[in-house]
Amino acid sequence: SLDRDSYNSGDWFNAIDFSGQFNGFGRGLPPASRNESSWAIQGPLLQDDWLRPSPEEIAAARSQALDLLRLRASTPLFSLGSTRLIQDKLTFPGAGFGAPAGVIVMLIDDTRGGHDVDPELDAVLVVINASGQTLTQPLPELVGRDFRLSPIQAEGADEVVRRTGFDRASGTISVPARTVAVLVQQSR
């Protein structure tokens, strides 16, 4: 609980409750070797029942994690396999000076580089918005492209990600705060 490195903390802290009723948070102060200087702050937090996830929150987190695993397995574009394919197909639109803090936009473009990795998709657009605000970002290089939220997320457990949008005419992406969104462009 609140240990930044619980690898060697043992089963007391790292136990798995397959019933989904408890996740171990608040079980006790983390080991002194790396954490004793923070115990005065950590102690009251660990005693606060409001900070312990409910069984419903644990189930929601599990379902959302399973959606991410399904996304990872949904297209071979997430496992290009060679340096050459990565260099050919992967770009980061909107990156660089002036890019919004806490945001990563990654485009895996299967129309580039000759070899068609996924016949079903022309591209995958991954947006990681770790900021506390909804991201609305024009990406001029994506004007005219037809990106839609992946069916896995559109039909998945996370209701927040469904507010993700892409405007084809302006190339503008909109992603809620603290959200990872995966958009796809079907093959033409």
Which residues does each PLM region occupy?
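A short acidic, often aromatic-flanked loop/helix-cap motif at beta-alpha or helix-coil junctions
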Residues: A157-E159, V180-A181
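A structural detector for beta-sheet-dominated domains
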Residues: D109, P140, S150-I152, P176
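C-terminal beta-strand-rich structural cap/linker in extracellular carbohydrate-active enzymes
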Residues: T164-R188
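Solvent-exposed beta-hairpin/edge-strand motifs
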Residues: L142-D158
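Loop/helix patches that line or flank the sugar-binding groove of alpha-linked glycan CAZymes
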Residues: S1-L125, A130-R145
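Conserved active-site loop/cleft motifs that coordinate metal ions or position small ligands
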Residues: L125-I128, S150-P151, V182-V184
